[in-house]
UniProtKB/Swiss-Prot annotation:
Positions annotated to bind substrate: 22, 25, 66, 79, 115, 136
Binding site for acetyl-CoA: 81-83, 120
Gene3D superfamilies from the UniProt entry: 3.40.630.30
GO molecular function, one term: aminoglycoside 6'-N-acetyltransferase activity
InterPro entries: Acyl_CoA_acyltransferase, Aminoglycoside_N6-AcTrfrase, GNAT_dom
A biological process from GO: response to antibiotic
Protein name: Aminoglycoside N(6')-acetyltransferase type 1
Keywords: Acyltransferase, Antibiotic resistance, Plasmid, Transferase
Length: 146
């Protein structure tokens, strides 16, 4: 397995995996992806097999605003991670997360946070397997006023 930061030439591999994680409109993804790869406080990684098949992606950021459950700032934040089902439980997600931890230290981060939907038990289990622990549960509300 080979893990590398994403460049412009790898947008199609990233897009394919990103659409599996967040099934949305490709044109919206592409526009956002092109912006993300230019931002120093964002990290995008792809994992490839020895035969150059893209099998996993990770997106992370450095957040300077308050992050639920953390005590410091800045905080590394796992924005999204996806491993093709047939490659799960083989250490790929661990390898991706370790790369973020190394990168985040350049920004003086001492905490690494993430979130998951309350009902996404698969994500909860993955986070725990990667060394994260639950800090709090939050339900967001909104009210239209105009």
């Amino acid at each position: 397995m080979n893990i590398m930061p994403i460049s412009e030439s790898q947008l199609s591999d990233w897009l394919a995996l990103r659409c599996l994680l967040w099934p949305d409109h490709e044109d919206v993804h592409l526009q956002e992806m092109r912006q993300l790869i230019t931002q120093a406080h964002r990290l995008q990684l792809l994992a490839y097999t020895d035969t150059q098949q893209a099998i996993a992606m990770l997106e992370a950021s450095i957040r300077y605003e308050y992050v639920n459950g953390t005590q410091t700032s800045p905080v590394a934040f796992l924005e999204g991670i996806f491993v093709l089902p047939e490659y799960r439980r083989s250490g790929i997600a661990t390898g991706l997360v370790q790369q973020v931890e190394i990168w985040a230290k350049q920004f003086a981060c001492t905490e690494f946070a993430s979130d998951a939907a309350l009902d996404n038990q698969i994500s909860h289990a993955m986070h725990q397997a990667l060394g994260f622990h639950e800090t709090e549960r939050v339900v967001y509300f909104k009210k239209n006023i105009g």
